[in-house]
UniProtKB/Swiss-Prot annotation:
PANTHER family linked to this entry: NACHT DOMAIN- AND WD REPEAT-CONTAINING PROTEIN 1
Protein name, entry field: NACHT domain- and WD repeat-containing protein 1
High-level lineage: Eukaryota, Metazoa, Chordata, Craniata, Vertebrata
Tissue: Expressed at highest levels in prostate, followed by testis, retina, trachea and optic nerve. Also detected in brain, epididymis, lung, vagina and pituitary. In the prostate, tends to be up-regulated during malignant progression compared to normal epithelium (at protein level).
Domain of life: Eukaryota
Domain NACHT: 335-661
GO CC annotations, alphabetized: cytosol; nucleolus
Subunit structure: May interact with HSP90AA1, HSP90AB1 and BAG2.
GO terms for MF: ATP binding
Amino acid sequence: MQRGKPCRALPTLKCQTFCQRHGLMFEVVDLRWGIRNIEATDHLTTELCLEEVDRCWKTSIGPAFVALIGDQYGPCLIPSRIDEKEWEVLRDHLTARPSDLELVARYFQRDENAFPPTYVLQAPGTGEACEPEEATLTSVLRSGAQEARRLGLITQEQWQHYHRSVIEWEIERSLLSSEDREQGATVFLREIQDLHKHILEDCALRMVDRLADGCLDADAQNLLSSLKSHITDMHPGVLKTHRLPWSRDLVNPKNKTHACYLKELGEQFVVRANHQVLTRLRELDTAGQELAWLYQEIRHHLWQSSEVIQTFCGRQELLARLGQQLRHDDSKQHTPLVLFGPPGIGKTALMCKLAEQMPRLLGHKTVTVLRLLGTSQMSSDARGLLKSICFQVCLAYGLPLPPAQVLDAHTRVVQFFHTLLHTVSCRNFESLVLLLDAMDDLDSVRHARRVPWLPLNCPPRVHLILSACSGALGVLDTLQRVLLDPEAYWEVKPLSGNQGQQMIQLLLAAARRTLSPVHTDLLWASLPECGNPGRLRLAFEEARKWASFTVPVPLATTAEEATHQLCTRLEQTHGQLLVAHVLGYIVSSRHGLSEAELKDVLSLDDEVLQDVYRDWTPPSKELLRFPPLLWVRLRRDLGYYLARRPVDGFTLLAIAHRQLVEVVRERYLSGSERAKRHGVLADFFSGTWSQGTKKLITLPLVGKPLNLDRKVAPQPLWFSHTVANLRKLKELPYHLLHSGRLEELKQEVLGSMSWISCRGISGGIEDLLDDFDLCAPHLDSPEVGLVREALQLCRPAVELRGMERSLLYTELLARLHFFATSHPALVGQLCQQAQSWFQLCAHPVLVPLGGFLQPPGGPLRATLSGCHKGITAMAWGVEEKLLVIGTQDGIMAVWDMEEQHVIHMLTGHTGEVRCVKIFAKGTLANSASKDYTLHLWNLLSGQEKFTIWDGGSKNPAEPQIWNLHVDEAHKVVYSASGSKINAWNLETAEPVFHILGDASDPWMCMAVLASQATLLTVSRDGVVSLWSSATGKLQGKQHMSSIKEETPTCAVSVQKQGKLVTGFSNGSISLVSSKGDRLLEKLPDAVRFLVVSEDESLLAAGFGRSVRIFLADSRGFRRFMAMDLEHEDMVETAVFGTENNLIITGSLDALIQVWSLSEQGTLLDILEGVGAPVSLLARGGALVASASPQSSSFKVWDLSDAHRSRVPAPFLDRTGLTAVSHNGSYVYFPKIGDKNKVTIWDLAEGEEQDSLDTSSEIRCLEVAEQRKLLFTGLVSGVVLVFPLNSRQDVICIPPPEARKAINCMSLSKCEDRLAIAYDNIVLVLDITSGDPCPVIDGPRYTFYTQLPETLSSVAILTDYRVVYSMTNGDLFLYECATSKAFPLETHRSRVACVEVSHKEQLVVSGSEDALLCLWDLQARKWKFEMSYTSSYCRGVQCACFSKDDKYVYVGLKDRSILVWSVLDGTLLTVQFVHAVVNRIIPTTSGFIAPTRHGYLIRENFQCLSAKASPQDPLKNFKKAMWMVKSRQREELVAAAGAPQDLESESAQGNETKSNKCSQVCLIV
């Protein structure tokens, strides 16, 4: 076949596509393509081809070798090297022929630097006529070898070196040398029928071997026949034979037979290669490769380590001292060790040797984990590093692997890592040693101010050893800022002169080389007293190439000069431009380049191609490629300086040495050259010139532009539905950014929903955010910031429900749609792309029609979570940049809120952390815990300064308080717990005094009044005690005069007034001082908390569902506002704003409310907490953090612009009593602060339009959309009806009994009936048309439930049937016309909603235990029952039927919406909307729904296929189970008393399959 065609023909492209779909990279290696014939058959090319064969077998998991054998045996080359003994045998036989001996001696020179000495073939001099002499030389050597073989002086294998062709050498190396290579090899044999009859014809001679005189080479033909027979005998399974009839123009491409043969050959190649790939993949799947990535990572570092320590020498004293230190530290807590020294000093070799000797140093059961950082993808960043270490340690110790919830967030992985180390320590058995070499090569450390994941103290039996470079890189300085113990740092010093010489000798011996005395002197003259192993290795790499008969160039004296010398040598050998571009591309890549990628990139580089084809033209007129042989030659000379790193399942090339990277940047990537390299890489990874797109080039010998196909690999985002193009995802943004193609970056990456979804699904939300963090600082684009913040807001949904397309598209569209018009360039395009995707989505999906999730630019800055239990304490540190949290399981975490990650894990406590106090300008923290210890921490370093046993009472029945006060002036910390008060010196941790109280009357409140040097306590019985804060001596004791028979519940000190404000169980607030006490206020309920502003001018008291504000005055405090700040649930905590113009309050219903004090208590915003009672609020500047003991998550809000109007402004409803009119234009809800009024909110304008006075508190709201009526149900029992077109008018419906509060109301679907439900009474009224407004008549019917339980929900039908439910779960159908009540099957808990279908044949009911039932009203039995179980489920909130009654839309209290098929009970889709939906109102193709966040959801439900699988949207749900039960149709028909007319029911759209089994969908 024509050379070059197989490697780039259509079949290989098909194989490439096939492999990409399976996550594999397909690389064709044909080193003889694109080069001149003289180079194709030289000795170096042959050697490189054989090396490539070995590389293919080592690398490939599928096809590794393909041979195309025709009727040519090929040329036989003479050996390029002859061993000394073999040379002597040949010389002895040539002694009788002096001219032959002289010829051989002229071409071969003895290299005594080889071991053993070798005779090396010399290239002919310039201008010499070498071909005749070479032919003679070949004949002479072959005859000498033949004679030596006949006499038995050389072996058959040695003889073959003179008689084998290049083809046979390659087949021997790849196939015949082993019996187990059938799986990856294929040999195509071409046999031409009757060729022997035409063998002497001129046209046939082109197909066979010829001698120099043009005659047939019979010996070559015999050897070819022997080779074919050998292949057939050893590996018949790899053979594919093609028999062609003889033809004079057989090899003419226009010959149909020839074309058919080529097509068949290509098809066979594709089938064979694909089969080999699939076979191997099945074997890997069978072997269980879930943790293949981990095993590959471990093997990589072990292999690297074994390579490094082969030439290790010296350091024995340092190893011994390190071993002694490890044994000394093994039984106690200690700091990590850091080995440091200049680059190249031998730190890596020492770390690898230490890992090898660890079993001897600490015992044979020691678990050792070694990572050579930066040599693989997972060891290049902290996220991958910690993940791999955690998995390896868990497997080694038999511990559970990190769950998916931990792996979803890097902060959780960090905390899991710290916890894992302590778990291993507590086993008290095997020691664990973690060795992390080259901290400088860890991306997250290189430019960081700290190392947030680094344990500052190692527990017993856990050791952490790091290495770092000293010098200008700064990583060692970073470590020294966090690891303060000077004993932790161990300097690695240079080798001695003797050790340096020993190292060189070891390297030479490993390479089977030596140095002559002259060369040895030259080497050491260039390296006087050099003990730097890196510099020695550079010298060795040069010296190993010295032959004994050459005079080498003197070596450079410094490492930098040696690296420049290396580049100069490479340029002289391979050309300056090629070396500059190859090294430039490798260094410019983000993670490295595979060999296939590098060859593709070079094929796109016009400068390189013009330089390569300066003296000859490429072999093809259709395509243009870079000749791969040129790269392989350069790769061989790079050798030791080239590293291979496993990344995403591929092997990537990178520069192994920092010094060479710096030199490459200096020599080849200065100025515009850097942007050019990134530009070509961007072209490659974007696929600009792939898939047949041709690129113009002008070659020197052609002189005109050529438009040629470069045949580079295509670069789609997805290779298949499940395999993403990870290389493109990771490299393209980086190269677009650094090539200056910023608009393309914004359009193709940051502004592409396809890119965002692919990156998010394949790499997770953190990788996606990393891309935006990489690019955003270089882009002056507010739109990029909006998208980045929107992605950050998506994190809770992704962590809760898993990353998948519909979730990501919904999240971004519902958050960014608000800005689509104002920011059309990027945000508008993203929204359009999302809408287009939804239109084509094949699965059932809810399609957002507008924004309804919290948009970027709002107050929420972050939602963060940790790998710990609920949060019990919280405080801000240095300049409001650090947030310290304490948890139920005793963990203290210090968060950097600028970078939003944990910087320290403080693990001293064993019990729940109850209090944290920050002082010393935010740099120190005191913490108190249920374990009765106090800890003092340095927040900057994360170090524990001391621990104090506080000696609290262990009596669980005794009331416990945890109160800390830090007196910085006197350097004393006071703690109160139970009946004991302690004072400790902050510097020495020595006790200052102890005060013991009366166990029968324990203290409930304690304060240190610094201005009076007094310590004040209030006991349970109201006894006030005064103590000296300096000595602890009692100064006085008295009973409170202002309080009788109340127990203290909370207190806060007011230092300026010298008073303790104390709250009591019956609502009293008292001011207590050393002079006595005074009643400040009597509240209606028990005081739940007291807080004062920073300047102590304001006081807030929480009681029941309200907060009252007081203003400081001369007597203490007075009431600040006439109105109280009200919540819908019990208030839990509060905090004042920076300038006392705000107060932020939190309540039991997980809501946070922001009030303006400068506007007399105006509610500015309602914020959603973490889904649990808001028990903790902490302010740091303009930032407010909220948390709860019931959640491991916390939120951080920026309230600096709380007074600024937000666009769009959400409606502020906290009751959930919302109604909607005018197709979602207006929302109605009880007015904030005055529930006797209805607020009318204009959604388009984002403001209140009007309000309606109801004169009584509102209990429920309903809107008759068609009749334009608003119904308000009141606590008084009255229903007021407001015509929406004339709101000044009102219709009053009186209650049946005085003061009976309304529970709920319902309108029939035609809006002609109204049902009003009280505790146990239901009124049914008629609504008829009238002028100017509808007329409400009745009540037409009134009935009593006659049950002890109260009504919870009601639904009315046009025919006067009523479906109602009770608080205990009972459900009834009542026929008003006959006064009959029919009990339906009971729910297991309170029914939250009952809704009737539009055709009034079905009813859906939902209960608080998340059980939904679909009822057939005619049969009065449920058709389908669906239950939902999850760790987040809190029951059903609301439901409705679609307009066509095909679906049921359900809002759950876990802040999600589901769609349920009425036809067969199938769960179609679930959507997480971040907020509880108050009600759902159907529209023509979907629904609208107001949420507790103040937004109106507008969505269409799209189900393109009637048989669409409902499984796909649910596959990523975590810890959730749906179960659907269906009742057999015959049972329903029998219950209804109707004939089983299947067609009639089918016409109603209610057909269901008989014998339908229960459906169970388990979502893990």
